[in-house]
Regions:
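Bacterial Sec-dependent N-terminal signal peptides
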Residues: 1-10
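Conserved N-terminal structural module of periplasmic/extracytoplasmic solute-binding proteins
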Residues: 8, 24-219, 255-258, 264-273, ...
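C-terminal motif of bacterial Sec signal peptides marking the signal peptidase cleavage site
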Residues: 18-22
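General small-molecule cofactor/ligand-binding pocket signal
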Residues: 97-103, 308-309, 352-354
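Paired acidic/hydrophobic, glycine-rich loop segments that form the ligand-binding mouth/hinge
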Residues: 123-127, 328-333
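Ligand-binding "clamshell"
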Residues: 135-148, 340-362
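Helix-loop-helix "hinge/cap" segment bordering the ligand-binding cleft or interdomain interface
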Residues: 152, 174, 179-253, 274-321, ...
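Conserved small-residue motifs centered on glycine
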Residues: 403-540
Length: 592
């Protein structure tokens, strides 16, 4: 295997808003650029100072012709042409339409990727995981940005991170890709208000069942069972369950299980579990957290706590259920957006973290160097379109572009008071209710028109120079003050901490792990085949085990799964991944 010896720090989490767009349907086949004339001709030119002090001018960019951008995006939960309020902003500024090609919802993402790569045109804009980007650079599918990127002032703010990542591509001398979720806060900081994944439930319901101390996941399940027994339906009379799952985010394993492994100090990476102690073990290790948390879901189902729709529903259905309070356990921090509001907090009904004493949370640090995905321009685009795409990317990294991505639009979503941003009522409710967008801003429902790219160049924790506060709405001083409610005050009084981050750190229940953004070894043809076959087995078996008939059936299915994997070359795959992640662990040790 061939590894680059450079490592940099990055975040492996996905920021709060990055998962809020639901899955969609619709054709996302490659479209040709059209040449319809707009009513007015717009040209832009930018003059900037490069890192060397030389003045460089960006060529004039004409927006005279409409440009439909084929956007291949592994982060997207929507497939088709962006619509609604975000579409209007992009169309008005750049005369562009974004045709999002989403392997995650295409039915067969691997086949889509291979087909488009073979055709020599993956997309005009491309978001990929690091390893796939490395492969595409070597295949000639990615446009060289080396000679132009310094001309773009907003991208240039992150030149340290951009150069660090690109030093791992090719011979390290050129710039091809821009890391995503970067910030300027420093490489080892964790400045989020909440941990990324942890048990969360309604404060009112937790107190209603006696606010029990939770020593382990058995106690957590018993608490949830009491809540579901008291509330088998929501206020509308719809059935409600402690736990609801969805499978359309699954990749090589059951994603819902993989997120919960972090509660017990391990993160799933390919076929292996990487621990807070820098250990690596196979995902199939019975002493590992994947087995433990898969069994947690099985035990929950045996107790009648798992939504029977889980095996068939998609993310859209899940969102609807959260908005109607039909799900009693959350784990992602960003799920708060589908229910919590300051008003509900004053009623004491917001969801909030509930400590489980035996957890040791695997929490990655903030995303200084990027999160493991990158954005690039396809090599097949014309010179004219290349200039337009670079202009768009620079805006996407600008304070205006970042503010729109993380905070929405002024007037509808927030107002400006004394130089600070304050969420409106619609802003507070934009993910939990139907917020109508005025026709002159694009019309429709706000959430439906949200940015379907679903990843950002700049993370929400970065500082907006216009306010000297983070871009993320939950980190605005006005929002923090609004969220100081009956719920948070009672929680702090009970647990003796200002928030979950403070509580978990103080009680040695959380380890902040330096995130590593490194171009890892690319799968060989044989390993790629083994990974696909093993991934299909793991996903199928994991879902079946959640609904196993009894303990004996669960154990038999686990053993059958591991036997099947061994016959497919599992040992070779885990050996490959163990070596693959070795440089990442060495870089992590150096950063600790």
């Amino acid at each position: 295997m061939k590894f680059k010896k450079f490592a940099s720090l990055a975040l492996s989490t996905v920021m709060a808003a990055s998962m809020l767009a639901g899955c969609g349907s619709g054709a996302a086949e490659s479209t040709e650029t059209t040449s319809n004339q707009t009513e007015t001709k717009t040209e832009t030119a930018t003059t900037t100072e490069t890192a060397s002090g030389d003045t460089a001018a960006v060529s004039e960019v004409s927006h005279d012709s409409e440009y439909t951008v084929d956007f291949y995006d592994v982060a997207a939960n929507f497939q088709g042409v962006q619509s609604g309020w975000y579409s209007k902003i992009v169309k008005d500024k750049f005369n562009m339409n974004l045709n999002i090609i989403a392997p995650q919802v295409s039915g067969d993402g691997a086949a889509l990727y291979q087909t488009r790569c073979a055709a020599g045109a993956l997309g005009d804009l491309i978001i990929l995981d690091n390893a796939d980007m490395q492969e595409c650079v070597e295949s000639g599918l990615i446009h060289d940005l080396t000679d132009v990127i310094a001309q773009y002032p907003n991208l240039s703010k992150y030149m340290e991170q951009i150069k660090a990542f690109n030093s791992m591509l090719g011979d390290g001398s050129k710039i091809y890709a821009i890391p995503l979720e970067m910030n300027t806060n420093g490489p080892t900081a964790y400045k989020q208000l909440h941990v990324y994944t942890y048990p969360r439930m309604g404060w009112d319901m937790y107190n209603e069942v006696g606010a029990p101390e939770l020593k382990n996941t058995d106690d957590l399940l018993n608490c949830l069972a009491d809540i579901q027994k008291a509330h088998p339906q929501n206020d509308k009379g719809d059935p409600a369950y402690a736990i609801s799952l969805w499978k359309d985010w699954d990749s090589q394993y059951m994603e819902c299980v993989a997120q919960l492994t972090k509660w017990y100090g391990q993160e799933v990476n390919g076929s292996v579990l990487i621990g807070t102690d820098n250990s690596i073990v196979p995902l199939t290790d019975k002493a590992g957290a994947y087995y433990k948390m898969l069994k947690f879901f099985y035990q929950a189902n045996k107790m009648g706590l798992v939504d029977p729709d889980s095996a068939t529903q998609d993310w859209n259905m899940m969102v609807s259920k959260m908005q109607d309070k039909r799900v009693y356990l959350y784990w992602y921090s960003w799920q708060y957006g589908f229910w919590n509001t300051p008003a509900k907090g004053e009623e004491g009904v917001n969801y909030i973290e509930i400590p489980v004493a035996d957890t040791n949370l695997y929490q990655a640090s903030d995303t200084y160097y990027g999160d493991g995905r990158v954005i690039a321009v396809g090599s097949q685009v014309s010179d004219e379109n290349f200039a337009r795409l670079m202009e768009f990317l620079d805006w996407y990294a600008s304070p205006e572009g970042v503010q729109i991505q993380h905070g929405g639009t002024e007037g509808l979503i927030y107002t400006v008071e004394n130089g600070k941003y304050v969420l409106t009522e619609d802003g507070l409710n934009r993910f939990s209710a139907e917020v109508a967008v005025p026709e002159d801003q694009g019309g429709g429902n706000w959430n439906d028109g949200n940015n379907q790219i679903n990843q950002w160049i700049v993370a929400s924790c970065d500082i907006n120079p216009d306010t000297n506060e983070p871009y993320g709405t939950d980190m605005w001083s006005s929002t923090i003050k609004m969220n100081e409610t009956k719920t948070t005050k009672e929680w702090s009084e009970k647990f003796g901490a200002a928030d979950d981050v403070e509580y978990l750190l103080k009680n040695n229940m959380m380890t902040v792990v330096p995130s590593i953004n490194i171009a890892l070894a690319i799968d060989t043809t044989d390993i790629s085949l083994i990974r696909k076959q093993c991934g299909d087995i793991i996903k199928d078996a994991s879902w079946r085990m959640v609904f196993a008939a009894d303990d004996v059936d669960f154990e038999k299915q686990w053993d059958d799964m591991t036997s099947q994997l061994e016959g497919l070359g599992w040992a070779d795959l885990t050996a490959f991944d163990t070596e693959k992640y070795g440089p990442m662990l060495e870089a992590r040790k150096a950063a600790q």
